[in-house]
Amino acid sequence: MDGTDVTMLMREIGIRARAAAAELAFAEPSRKEEALNAAAEAMLARSDEILEANGRDLAFGAEKGLTPAMMDRLKLDAARIDGIVEGLRAVAGQPDPVGQVIAEWDRPSGLHIRRVRTPLGVVGVIYESRPNVTADAGALCLKSGNAVILRGGSESFHSSGAIHAALQDGLRQAGLPVDAIQRVPTRDRAAVAEMLRMVEHIDVIVPRGGKGLVGLVQAEARVPVFAHLEGICHVYADGDADLEKARRVVLNAKTRRTGICGSAECLLIDRAFLAKHGPVLIEDLLKAGVEVRAEGELAEVPGTVPAQPEDFGREFLDMIIAAKVVGGVDEAIAHIRRYGSSHTESILTENDATAERFFRRLDSAILMRNASTQFADGGEFGMGAEIGIATGKMHARGPVGAEQLTSFKYLVTGDGTIRA
């Protein structure tokens, strides 16, 4: 497909999306719920087709030499399809955010003012190897009254296509425009460049992928962007941490799934914790098969690898973690401010004052206490799914669910009211 063809294709998709968004903006909540539940049923009915398509994508990924972490992100199986289905049903069952009254007040002038949620319009989602993003993004945009244009990576091309077909089945059954959820039907990378320039047709871009993709989108987009560049998540084991809680959380935060953005990439251990318990957290990680890149006294633990300066502030997305000893919560905070990506940080402590200091003095999108960073997920937050984790400070932060995909407008009522 040459450049002219891609430009025309994307323009046509944009025009159709804008028309669908105008209709979705006032669609009844019951019809959106019906579409999502029908899409969930279609996903189950098409599961064999989806798995067959995923098999082709996995073969393509293996030929391209994708890393184990990327192959894990790409892979679908029966359990992951069930997870997608449950996510669709969960989003369907949530309150509809469109039209919700955020605030309401009266003015001495006699005006009654309401601030109510309204859809953004058209959302563009650009993602790499995770085919489940097709379902998550489609569902959340539909729930929030937005049309969406999906541009999946070449690795997940067939899987995304099969999932997209199920979503459109749901739209048809509910009598909603199928153009509400469109997928870019080409692997041509020129389509990404076109999306980033489509200010007339797209209201916001959400990139889901690695540092290269997100950095490209942030650098070149003329359309506003919700994004996080990297998930450099920290776990800090405080001197007042409960040992057994700390052992459970650290192992889960690193090893449950290493290829997701909520995976812990750096372990900070209070010197007081080390004095009480020794290097047990490091030993647990080593026994689990994690490569621990350790600094200072932790590098003396047998089996560790000496850390290099570039290991701190690095997103490994693998069975690798950086580790160092710090002299208390303030030193941990200083380290996170220097090396973190404003994604997710967790403190392990039984000391309320220390936890509060950690929460107040850090400004990452998600801060946790005695919990695994792997909970940094819209589904785990009760959103049903997420379209991404936003780490910026404008509009949306943290998991971006249906509510975060809305803006607002003011409804002002008077009674022949005039301004003096």
Swiss-Prot record:
Major location, coarse class? cytoplasm
Q: What is its EC number?
A: 1.2.1.41
What CDD domains is this protein classified in? ALDH_F18-19_ProA-GPR
One GO biological process this protein is involved in is: L-proline biosynthetic process
Q: Name one GO cellular component term.
A: cytoplasm
Q: Where in the cell is it found?
A: Cytoplasm
Q: Which Pfam families match?
A: Aldedh
In which domain of life is the source organism classified? Bacteria
The molecular function terms in GO held by this entry are:
glutamate-5-semialdehyde dehydrogenase activity; NADP binding
Q: Which reaction does it catalyse?
A: L-glutamate 5-semialdehyde + phosphate + NADP(+) = L-glutamyl 5-phosphate + NADPH + H(+)
Q: Does the entry feature the keyword Amino-acid biosynthesis, yes or no?
A: yes
Protein purpose: Catalyzes the NADPH-dependent reduction of L-glutamate 5-phosphate into L-glutamate 5-semialdehyde and phosphate. The product spontaneously undergoes cyclization to form 1-pyrroline-5-carboxylate.
**PANTHER family xref list:** DELTA-1-PYRROLINE-5-CARBOXYLATE SYNTHASE, GLUTAMATE SEMIALDEHYDE DEHYDROGENASE
Family statement drawn from the similarity comment of this UniProt entry? Belongs to the gamma-glutamyl phosphate reductase family.
What's the name of the protein?
Gamma-glutamyl phosphate reductase
Organism, by scientific name, is Cereibacter sphaeroides (strain KD131 / KCTC 12085) (Rhodobacter sphaeroides)
